[in-house]
Amino acid sequence: MSYLLDTNIVSETIRRNPNKAVISWLDQIPAEALFVSVLTLGEIRKGIEALPDRRRREKLRLWLEHDLPAWFEGRVLPVGLAIADRWGRLLAEVGRPVPTIDSLLAATALHHELRLVTRNAGDFDYPGLEVINPFG
């Protein structure tokens, strides 16, 4: 069983006071079963660059550029042709406007047969997608 982590799960790991249930859940899963999307890395970059505290921003830049790639080495999933195709089919199946990044994450999870792990389970109501909320 493998998992695609949403941005809020990855970000939780570097919070000053992370949610204990999330950390406990992550500790129980082998690292090789955890995946992230390049979209998550982009969302994290956006958040870091918007931080007003220069020292915190620099610390998190190092984490994003060094620690995070090491944690997910070989498990950062791109958005390529196959994901774009799965995304288009998913949007047609859903038949309603949906957020682009969330729906691309859903398509990525479905394409790779991963469970999506997020705090925002309600944002990922897509056919066939299994969603896990470790926040409890």
What positions do the PLM features span?
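Acidic, PIN/NYN-like endoribonuclease modules and their adjacent C-terminal/linker elements
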Residues: 1, 106, 110-136
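Nucleotide phosphate-binding site architecture
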Residues: 10-11, 42-45, 125, 132
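Alpha-helix capping/helix-boundary segments
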Residues: 9-10, 40, 83, 105, ...
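Active-site neighborhoods of divalent-metal-dependent phosphate/nucleic-acid chemistry enzymes
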Residues: 46-52, 70-119
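Short, flexible helix/strand-to-coil boundary loops that buttress conserved ligand/catalytic motifs
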Residues: 14, 26, 48, 91, ...
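Active-site phosphate/pyrophosphate-handling residues
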Residues: 8, 21, 85, 103-104, ...
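Generic structural signal for small/hydrophobic residues in well-ordered secondary structure
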Residues: 6-7, 22, 44, 87, ...
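Short, well-structured N-terminal submotif of metal-dependent ribonuclease cores
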Residues: 1-36, 49-66
